[in-house]
Amino acid sequence: MSRGMTTEGASLTAAASSSASTWLTESTPSTPSSSGSSYPALSTFSSCSNSASSPDEADPMSEMSPKISVASMILLKDMEEFLHLYVSSANMHPSNFVRHHIESFDDMLWNEFPAMVAREKPVSVKGYRVKFGTVRYEPPCPDGKPWEKLTPAMARRTDATYHSAAVCDLTVTDPKGLETVYPRLELCKIPVMVGSAVCWTRTEGSPLPGECPSDPGGYFIIKGKERVVVPHIRPAYDQPCVYKNGDGWLCEFRSVNRETRQTVLVQAKTDCRRKLEFSLPYIKQYVPVGLVFKALGKTAREAVAMCGLGSFLGDEVSCRTVHHQSMAALLMEQHASAPEDPVADLAKHVPDGRSVYSKQAEGAKQAKYADRASVEEDRNAKGSKEDYVRHVLAGEIFLHGGDAAEHLGWMVKRMADAASGIGTCTDRDDLANKRVDATGPLIAFLLDGLLKQYVKLFVKSAGCQKNLCPYTVLQNSMVMTNSLHMCFATGNWTVKRLGPPSYVRVGVSQVLSNNNYGARVSHLRRIMHAVSFRGKNIRMRQLHSSHYGFLCPYETPEGEKVGIVLNMAEGAGFSLETPREVVLATVRLGKGLPGFFEGAPARLAWSGAAGSASVDVDGVLCGVTGDPVGFVREARLCLPGVSVVWKKVEREIHLLGCQGRFVRRVLDPEGIRGSGYDSPPAPEERDIEMDPAPSSSPSDSLPCPPGVYVCAQELSVCSLGDGEYADPPASEILTDAMSSVIPFYDHTQSPRNAYQSNMGKQAIGFPAVNCSDRYDATLHRLDYPQKSLVDSRSVKRLGFDEMAHGALPVVAIMTAGGFNQEDSVVLNASSLDRGLFSCVTYRTVSCADKRRTKYDSEVVCLPDWGLRNREWDYDLLGDDGVIDPSCAGALARRVEGKRKAAKRPAGQRTGGGPAGLCDALWIPAGTVLVGKVSHSLGPGGNPMRRDVSLTVKQSEEGYLDRVTVDVDSDGKKLVKVRLRTPRHPEMGDKFASFTAQKGTCGAVLTQEDMPFDKDGVVPDLIINPHAFPSRMTVNYLLQMCFGTAACKLGKTYDATAFEREDVVRDIAEAAKEAGIDCWDSVLHSGSTGRRLPTKIFMAPCPYQRLKHMVSGKMHSRTHGPTDALTRQPVAGRSREGGIKIGEMEQWCKISHGASESLKESVYDMSDKYEVPVCKECGRISDHFEYCRMCDATDMSLVKLPYTTKILFQELRSIGISIAFK
C-alpha cells in the first residue's frame, strides 16, 4: 500500500517530479515494481498532475515554489471544508477493504515469482543444459479441460481448487549443442485469489453468474472451501535497534539478503566506560570494536569519525557529549592495543569445527555459503580460520549490502546517542519498528523454497534415467503444486529443507468466516503477531500509542489470543516494495536531490556541521545531503511510494521502500506528497495467457479512496496538523469494520465495544446474495433483515445497509412482571409469527466416489437389500443412489405420515429455494440421503462390502432444498444434498443489541398479554432496566431517542462517533422537530387493561439474533453409543453422546442432598460395573468362585465405575495393590 495517492485534484508536479517521471518510464521499463504503487493507484490520479507540466514547458521558478494542490486552490477554504470533502468522498468500493490482500498477491505474481525464476541459474545434468524462460499465467480452468472456464462459483460447487497454471518457456541444450525451446512448461498451479488480476471476476468486468456483487474478494478457494491468508507481523530488518541492557546499551542489526532470504544478526554492546564489543556472525564470543575496525582496514581517526563520536581538531577530538568522548577514547584505546595482524587475532575466537559444527549443521552451512563463497573443509587449521574471518568481514556481517565499517559505526553512533540522551531506545512494540508479511510475501516464501526443491528433485530424477528427456521430467513433477495446496489446506506454512527443521507458522491459512457479511469483511482484515498464543509477553498484547489509525483498539478476541490477533483500522494498509535500485536512481536523477552527495561517508554528517544529514535507503548508507529540508521536500514529491523519515536530532534521513510497512490515510492540504510518475499500462487482463509486466500494477483498476498514505515511521517523526499532514476524523480511521458500525461508540465503556465487535460476527444476517448457489457445511440466513434508522457513516461505506445482519423491533425498557427476566428479554409472539428474527439454517451433505486401491473404494449407488441398515429409511433413493424428491409414492407417505410425527403444517413455506416439490418434502432423522457402499478386503483376503450411506442425524432434520450431482476435480461423481431448517425464535435463544446488551429470551408472550400505549403500539421486545446501570450503555438510549424522532419524521440520523459536539442539544432539537414533548409513554397492561403506575420508555432499537440457538444445542438421550475403552457415553451432540456431569454439577447435587440423583448420573447411566472381591484379602479377583491370591472361596460383588476398575488395573501393573475393606 503506497502513500503517494492524492485526492482527485492531485498536486501540481514540479519540473523535478516531471523529469523523474520521464526518466523512470523510459529508462527502467523492466525494473520489478518500479512504481512502488499499491493502494493509491498512480495511473488513476496521476494524469492530472503529470499533464500539467512537462520537462520542456516547465516554469524555471517551479522548483523553488511550494507544491500547492488544486483542491486547496479551488475548493478548500479552511480545514473544516477539507475534512467535509474527505468524508463525503470516502464511500469506498468493497474491494478497497481487501486491497492489501489483492495488491500484495498481484505484486507476487507479476514481480516476485518471475524474479525468482529469472534468478535461477541454468541447470546442467548429464550433458544437458536447462534454462527457464519468462513466466506467464493461464486463466483458471478445470484440470484437464483448458478450453473451459473455472469460475469461483464452479470451484465451490465442485470442491475444486481455484488455481492458475504458472507456465514458462524451457530452453534445453543437449550434449551435441542442439537447442530446443519448449513453449509451455507448467511449473506449478498457484491458488488464485478471488478478485486478483488473474481471476475471472476481474477479467470479465461484471459480476459472474453465481457470484455476489458485494463480495470483496481477497480470499482463496481450496478444495471448495474459502480460505484467507492472515498477514503476520514481524520485527523490521535492516536497521539498528538500541535497547537498554542492564547498566549498558545493546544495539542489534538484523540484515537480510532479499534474493536468498537469509538473515544475520549482529550485536554491539557498551557500558560507555570500559566495554565496547561487537559480535561477528557465526562467532559466539564478543570481540572489541576497535579490533574489528582495524581488521576492516580503518585507522583510529576514521573509526571515531565513522561512529559519529566527534571530529578531530589536530590531535584532539571534539565530541558532542561526555558519553561520546568516553566512547571515542575507548575506541582509540582498543584500536591502539590491537595487534598488527587483527585477522589472526580474530581467528583465535573462531571455535574448532568439531566442537561447533556437527555434520548436520556443517551441511547447512555449506549450502548457505554455496551461492557466495565456499568454506574450506578443515576449519581447525590456522590458515582456514583466517580465511574464514576474511570471508566473514568481506560479506557476511551485513547481508543487505553497503560498507561494513560504516554500518558498524552506525551501530556505535546509535548507542552513543541513546546513552547521551540525544536519541531514544528502540521501542519493540512501536509499529514503526514492525513489518507485515502479507499474502504476497508469505506465498513468495513458499515458492522460493519449493522452486529450489523442484530443481533439486529434477537433478536427482534425471541422474537415474537412461533415456533422459528434461522437459518430460520437469513437466511431470508436481512437488510445487502439491506442497502449495497442502500449505493452503492445513495452514501450516513451511517448506522442507535440508539441515535442522525450520520454524513452522501455524494457522496462516484459515477458513473464511461466513456467518454474516460483517464477519466476512472483518476476517479479511485480520492480522496477527508471528508468536505463540501462549507467550507471556504482556507488552505485546497491550495497546500502544502507535496503533492509532493502524490497528483497531476494540476488535481482538478474548482469552489467550487477546492482543495477538488484531484487526486493521479502516484506513490502514501495507506498503508494497519499491526496489532499492529504483530509489537510488531517482535520488541520483539529473543533478540529484538538493544537496545530495552520492557516496559521501556518513561521518561528514554525523561529525560535521549541524546543517547536514546522512541518507540511507532501506538500511544502506548511500550518501550525505547538505540541505535536509530541500532533500526531504523533493524526495516526497519524486518518491510517492517511499517513506521519507527525517530524524533531525540524529541527523539521519531514511528512505524506506521495503514492503510491509504500516501505512494509513492522512490529509495533505499543502500538497506535500506528490503523485509521482505514471505507471506503465497494466497488462490486458482479458487475454487467455497473461504475460507478466514487472513494472506494472494490475490492481490499478481498483477504485482508490481519497487522501495520501503515510507510514508509521514517518508519522512518528512528523507533526500532524502542524503544516505537514492533517489527520482525518477519528471516526474514519480509529476502528475497523465491526466496531465502526456501533452507534455512538464514544458514549459507552470500552469493554462494551469489544464485546459487540465479537458478537457482531456471531449475528445471523445475510452473508451473500448468492446464498442459493452456495453449499457451505452450515449457513445461516436471516429471513427479514432490516436497516437501522440511526447508524454511522461506516454502515453505508461497508455496505451493511444492503447486507444487514439485524432487525428493528420496538423496544420497551420495563420489568414486565420480572418473571425470568434477570438478564433476559421478553419477545412478542405475534411479532415472531410475522417473521421477526426468523431465520433459515442450510446444511449441506457432500459425498463423492473414492478409489484408493483396487480393493479399497467407496461408490455412490443404491445399496442391495442384504447390506442395508434396518434402522435407516431408503425409500427416497433413486436408482443412482441419490435422494430423488420426485418419487411420488414415497413423497405421499412422507407428507402424510412424517408431517404428523414432526407436528408441522402441510405445505409450509420457509424460504430458501424455488417453490416446488422440495418445499414440501420434510426429511426426518434416519432418512438416507446418499447411498454408498464400501468395498474392501476382509481378514481372510475375501472381498467385503459394507453400507456407509449418508443419513440425516437427529439434530439435522429439515426440508429438502436442493440436490446437485456433479463431477469433482478428479473426475469422480460428487453429490451434494442441501437441507433447509427454519429456525423461529424460542426461549433460550440469544439476542444482542448493537451496543452489546446481550440477553437470552426469557419469555414469549402473545400480543394480547403485552403492554400497549394509547395509539395501540405494542413493543416487540422488552428489556430489563437493571441492565443499564452496570453496563453503562448510554449509546443504547441515544439510539432509541434518535430512532423515535426518525420514525416520526421519516428520515435517518447519523450516529457516527466523535461527530456531535453536544449530543444533548442535538436530541432536544430532534425532539422539537418531531413534536415530541416527552420521551416516555403511558402504557397499559395487556392482561388487566389497567394503566401502569410509571411511564415507560419505548422506541425502535436494532437488535441482532446470534447463532447460539436452543435448537442447535438442545440434546437428550436414554441410550446410545459408548466408548469402547471406558464404556462411558461418548461426548458430543452430533454423535448422540451423553450429558456431561462436571464438578460444578456434582457439588450442586450434593448441596441439594440429591445423592441418589448424583449416583444415577455418574454411575447408573454411565459405566456401571461389578467386580468380584475376595472377603479374606480384599483384592479384586479374576474369578467369581475363588481367589487365586489366597485360595479363599468367600467372594462378594462390588459395584464401581468401569473407569475405576481400569485405574486399579493400571496401578497394579506398576506394583501398587488395591485392597477393599
UniProtKB/Swiss-Prot annotation:
Zn(2+) binds at residues 1174, 1177, 1187, 1190. The keyword Nucleotide-binding does not apply. Mg(2+) binds at residue 823. CDD domains: RNA_pol_B_RPB2. InterPro entries: DNA-dir_RNA_pol_su2, DNA-dir_RNAP_su2_dom, DNA-dir_RNAP_su2_hyb_sf, RNA_pol_bsu_CS, RNA_pol_bsu_protrusion, RNA_pol_Rpb2_2_sf, RNA_pol_Rpb2_3, RNA_pol_Rpb2_7. Residues 1-54, 692-701 have a biased composition (Low complexity). Signal peptide: none annotated. It catalyses: RNA(n) + a ribonucleoside 5'-triphosphate = RNA(n+1) + diphosphate. One of its GO terms (cellular component) is DNA-directed RNA polymerase complex. GO terms for molecular function: DNA binding; DNA-directed RNA polymerase activity; ribonucleoside binding; zinc ion binding. Keywords: DNA-directed RNA polymerase, Magnesium, Metal-binding, Nucleotidyltransferase, Transcription, Transferase, Zinc, Zinc-finger. A zinc finger (C4-type) spans 1174-1190. Residues 1-63, 673-701 are annotated as: Disordered. Its EC number is 2.7.7.6. Component of the DNA-dependent RNA polymerase that catalyzes the transcription of DNA into RNA using the four ribonucleoside triphosphates as substrates. Second largest component of RNA polymerase II which synthesizes mRNA precursors and many functional non-coding RNAs. Proposed to contribute to the polymerase catalytic activity and forms the polymerase active center together with the largest subunit. Belongs to the RNA polymerase beta chain family. This is Putative DNA-directed RNA polymerase II subunit RPB2 homolog. It comes from Frog virus 3 (isolate Goorha).
